[in-house]
Amino acid sequence: MAREIKDIKEFVELARRSDIKSAIVKVNAKVNANGKKFKQTKFKVRGSRYQYTLVVNDASKAKKLQQSLPPTLKITNL
């Protein structure tokens, strides 16, 4: 089962739980309505029951969030 998280603070709290062992960071190239390219970053963490996903469209926020993930997580970049 999957759950989408909208709040960054809630996602960071989830990532610090004891049952969360791994994270996946996926960067997609997207085009907005004006035809301008941007990078969409998806953060996925696997819990015991759900896979939680956070979608970030701002590259600077995504970089800060990736640095704030706990060092105990096994992070895979796609």
Curated annotation (Swiss-Prot):
A GO BP annotation: protein-RNA complex assembly
Alphabetical UniProt keywords: Cytoplasm, Ribonucleoprotein, Ribosomal protein
One Gene Ontology CC term in the entry: hyphal cell wall
Predominant location category: cytoplasm
A Pfam family the protein falls into: Ribosomal_L38e
One annotated GO molecular function: structural constituent of ribosome
Localisation per UniProt entry: Cytoplasm
InterPro entries in the cross-refs: Ribosomal_eL38 (IPR002675), Ribosomal_eL38_sf (IPR038464)
Quaternary structure and partners: Component of the large ribosomal subunit. Mature ribosomes consist of a small (40S) and a large (60S) subunit. The 40S subunit contains about 32 different proteins and 1 molecule of RNA (18S). The 60S subunit contains 45 different proteins and 3 molecules of RNA (25S, 5.8S and 5S).
Family: Belongs to the eukaryotic ribosomal protein eL38 family.
Function: Component of the ribosome, a large ribonucleoprotein complex responsible for the synthesis of proteins in the cell. The small ribosomal subunit (SSU) binds messenger RNAs (mRNAs) and translates the encoded message by selecting cognate aminoacyl-transfer RNA (tRNA) molecules. The large subunit (LSU) contains the ribosomal catalytic site termed the peptidyl transferase center (PTC), which catalyzes the formation of peptide bonds, thereby polymerizing the amino acids delivered by tRNAs into a polypeptide chain.
Protein name: Large ribosomal subunit protein eL38
Classification lineage: Eukaryota, Fungi, Dikarya, Ascomycota, Saccharomycotina
